[in-house]
C-alpha cells in the first residue's frame, strides 16, 4: 500500500514542481505530454498478473526454468515498450497537434523524451513476480523512493534551465536509476539487473 501511494505521489511531482518553479502554463504543456506517455502504464500490470503464477510455480521446479521465464517476461515487456516509445518519439509532434492542438505544440519535444520512461517503468513492474517469490517486496518501496529522490534532485537543477524538457529528462533518468540501475547495487537483485539489461540490449 505504501509503495502504491509513493508511486502515485511520485507521478505528480514533476507537475507540482513545474507549476511552482516555472508556472501553470508550463505545467499544463507538460501534462499534455505525460498523458500520452502514461496512458500505456496499465499494460505491464495486466501482463505480469497473467504470468506471475507460472513464474512462481517455476521457482519450485528449478532455478533454471524460473529465471528462463523471468527473462522471457522481461524480453516481452521491453519489446512492447520499444514498440511504443520508438514510433511515439518520431510522431510526437503530430500526436500532440492531433490530440491537443497547435497551442500545445511545445509538448512535442517533452513527449519525445518522456515516452522513454515507459521502458524502465515497464521493466520495474515486470520485476514484481521476482520480488514476491523471493520475499523481497521491501525492495519495491526502496526502488520507488530512489526514483523519487533522483527525480526531485534533478528537477531542482533542470526545471529552472529547461522547464518541461528538464522535467522529462529528470523523469526518464530517475526511472533508469530506480527501476534498473538500483538492482546492481543490491547483491540479491543483481541477477535481475542482468536479465533487464539483456532484454534492453
Name each region found by the language model.
Residues 21-24, 133-134, 161:
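Helix-loop interface residues and adjacent transmembrane-helix termini in multi-pass membrane transporters
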Residues 37-63, 67, 130-133:
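Helix-loop junctions and terminal segments of transmembrane helices
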Residues 24-25, 64, 89-119:
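Interfacial segments at transmembrane-helix termini and the short loops linking adjacent helices
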Amino acid at each position: 500500500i505504501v509503495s502504491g501511494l509513493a508511486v502515485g505521489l511520485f507521478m505528480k511531482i514533476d507537475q507540482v514542481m513545474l507549476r511552482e518553479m516555472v508556472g501553470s502554463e508550463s505545467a499544463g504543456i507538460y501534462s499534455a505530454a505525460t498523458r500520452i506517455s502514461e496512458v500505456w502504464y496499465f499494460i505491464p500490470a495486466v501482463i505480469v498478473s497473467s504470468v506471475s503464477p507460472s513464474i512462481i510455480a517455476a521457482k519450485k521446479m528449478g532455478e533454471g526454468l524460473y529465471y528462463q521465464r523471468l527473462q522471457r517476461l522481461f524480453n516481452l515487456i521491453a519489446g512492447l515498450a520499444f514498440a511504443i516509445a520508438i514510433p511515439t518519439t518520431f510522431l510526437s509532434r503530430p500526436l500532440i497537434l492531433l490530440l491537443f492542438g497547435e497551442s500545445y505544440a511545445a509538448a512535442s519535444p517533452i513527449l519525445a523524451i518522456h515516452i522513454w520512461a515507459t521502458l524502465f517503468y515497464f521493466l520495474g513492474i515486470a520485476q514484481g513476480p521476482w520480488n514476491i517469490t523471493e520475499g523481497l517486496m521491501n525492495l519495491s518501496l526502496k526502488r520507488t523512493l530512489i526514483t523519487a529522490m533522483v527525480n526531485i534532485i534533478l528537477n531542482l537543477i533542470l526545471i529552472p534551465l529547461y522547464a518541461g524538457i528538464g522535467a522529462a529528462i529528470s523523469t526518464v533518468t530517475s526511472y533508469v536509476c530506480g527501476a534498473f540501475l538500483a538492482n546492481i547495487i543490491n547483491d540479491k537483485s543483481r541477477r535481475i539487473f542482468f536479465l533487464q539489461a539483456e532484454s534492453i540490449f
